[in-house]
Amino acid sequence: DSPKIEYTLRTIKSVIRSCEIAKRSFKDINIKIIISDDNSNQENLDKINQILQSTNIETQIISIKDNEFNDTISSVDTNGDKISDNMISNMRNILKSIQIAESDNSDLFYFLEDDYIHVDDAITEMLFTYEKISSQINDELFLCPADYPYLYSSIESSKIFFGNMRHWRTVNETLITFLTSKIMITKYIDKLKLMGTKRHHPMELMLHEIYEKEYCLSPIPSLTMHATNINSMYGVPPNFDWKKIWDENK
């Protein structure tokens, strides 16, 4: 029942801490945290900036301009129904994140919604796992940091991999938080942009179509908690000490 900004602040704190821990294992890695912002009020921006100033990791807030992308976002969904202003804001953030990834030549990109609180070793585990599994399958892939409860609501076959300190299983669905490579972004840029220009049902449908062709893995147990939907099938993962993670990121 906390205000939405509280989820965001704890998400940022947890990601920063996890990135700082990851740099101990990956000495030469260059990590940059970029926040796309769509008209947050100054009070909330000040709170975010205060957290960003506490780390030596490179950080940046990029504000989405007024009416940016509005001409490319369809005002109706695939059913012909008008979409809400809040949904348009979400889609603007998706398009801004993809735009940033398009113009940057980093090897890996982690697209993160603003309500995922991470365990300390989340980034370390994802980096080691990506490196290991991509070599094992001789290809790029997608990693989702959350072991969503809803993924157990149907009976699906999974392939099991061993990452760094966790098992990972193949999944066919995620929300819009995932890690992948620049190669994959370039390969599927049109589908990724469709998530921001047309409201599908589910919103992540284009991702799910990509996962029909590419590996997407999620960890067992989870590396993150989807805080906004904590009481739903998209919230607290199995065998996850949510209160500990919540309290550690005050």
Identify the role of each PLM range.
Residues 1-12, 44, 85-94, 118, ...:
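Phosphate/oxyanion-binding active-site loops and adjacent basic polyanion-contact surfaces
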Residues 4-7, 11-29:
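Short, acidic, metal-binding catalytic loop of nucleotide-sugar glycosyltransferases
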Residues 37-38:
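Acidic ATP/Mg2+-coordinating residue in the GHKL
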Residues 77, 108, 117-192:
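Conserved catalytic core of nucleotide-sugar-dependent glycosyltransferases
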Residues 90-95, 123, 172-176, 197-208:
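Conserved glycosyltransferase catalytic-site signature
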Residues 182-250:
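C-terminal catalytic/acceptor-binding lobe
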